Design a protein with these regions (language model features):
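Catalytic active-site module of serine/aspartate enzymes centered on a nucleophile-bearing elbow/loop
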Residues: 76, 80-120
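Amphipathic, alpha-helical segments enriched in basic
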Residues: 2, 6-9, 71, 82, ...
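Active-site-adjacent alpha-helix of alpha/beta-hydrolase-fold enzymes
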Residues: 55-85
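Alpha/beta-hydrolase
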Residues: 1-66
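Localized chelating/binding microdomains
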Residues: 6, 61, 71-74, 97-98, ...
């Protein structure tokens, strides 16, 4: 099993980067393209958090939830990407590989198992 590496929190900025309008436009255009025009002919692995947390008030739930995107929507839309889609859910953050070690281990185990099963 793989748990990844120790996370160097000191390397992460305390504040977020500014988000230019052009970046958000590109994201929205990409979402539209994926939603309407993508039909992959290969297996797809979609890994998402088990929950979302969007409240303005701080909560420990932020450590085990996606605070950026709705994992339910991601999972639903993932199903339209290909005829062979695997959805894997983990009680982790938006960036699953930055979640706590047990979640990272499960994420890597799932990813490696999926690769062994579907990628030749």
């Amino acid at each position: 099993s793989v748990a990844g590496w120790p996370i160097a929190h000191e390397w992460k900025r305390p504040e977020s980067y500014p988000v230019p309008a052009s970046w958000l436009e590109a994201i929205m255009a990409g979402h539209e393209t994926i939603e309407k025009d993508v039909a992959l002919e290969c297996p797809v692995l979609s890994m998402v958090s088990t929950s979302a947390y969007f409240d303005e008030e701080w909560s420990e739930r932020a450590f085990v939830s996606d605070t950026v995107l709705d994992p339910v929507v991601i999972a639903q839309r993932s199903l339209n990407l290909s005829n062979m889609v695997t959805i894997a859910r983990f009680p982790g953050k938006h960036d699953l590989v930055l979640s706590d070690a047990p979640v990272r281990e499960a994420v890597y185990d799932t990813m490696l198992g999926w690769l062994a099963a579907f990628v030749k």
